[in-house]
Amino acid sequence: SKSSTETPPSYNQLNYNENLLRFFNSKPVTAPVELDPPKLESSYVSSAREDARSTLSPVHGFEGSGGSGSSGNFTTGSNVRMSSVTNTSNAGTGTSGGGNSAGGASGGVGAVGVAANAPLVTVTLTESLLN
């Protein structure tokens, strides 16, 4: 038997399924695909924007490639923030980190200690950065 101290279900809990059906039957307005309002722009600008979108997408080829500490410093490119790299935590430093994906970093990068409200800085990969 039920305990007398248990609270009975509320009206909203009893009508949960009906509320869901009513919500989806009302066909709610969802966010548009483009969050920017439509603008008239030249075909050059729109094609350049499409090129930028395709080149700034995350690199999916290196996901989970940091096995046993080797080649564990690959990141996914889109979410790398280069300001305030203070490394205040030692989670995953020096080891592979086991696929720890914090803040867009995959493989063995681990937590780099980037503030959540730091501005997003895009960095173009050049040969001098690799050396």
Swiss-Prot record:
Residues 71-93 have a biased composition (Low complexity). GO terms for cellular component: nucleus; perinuclear region of cytoplasm. GO terms for biological process: rhythmic process. It is found in: Nucleus; Cytoplasm, Perinuclear region. Phosphorylated with a circadian rhythmicity, probably by the double-time protein (dbt). Phosphorylation could be implicated in the stability of per monomer and in the formation of heterodimer per-tim. Residues 29-109 are annotated as: Disordered. Residues 94-109 have a biased composition (Gly residues). Keywords: Biological rhythms, Cytoplasm, Nucleus, Phosphoprotein, Repeat. Essential for biological clock functions. Determines the period length of circadian and ultradian rhythms; an increase in PER dosage leads to shortened circadian rhythms and a decrease leads to lengthened circadian rhythms. Essential for the circadian rhythmicity of locomotor activity, eclosion behavior, and for the rhythmic component of the male courtship song that originates in the thoracic nervous system. The biological cycle depends on the rhythmic formation and nuclear localization of the TIM-PER complex. Light induces the degradation of TIM, which promotes elimination of PER. Forms a heterodimer with timeless (TIM); the complex then translocates into the nucleus. This is Period circadian protein. It comes from Zaprionus tuberculatus.
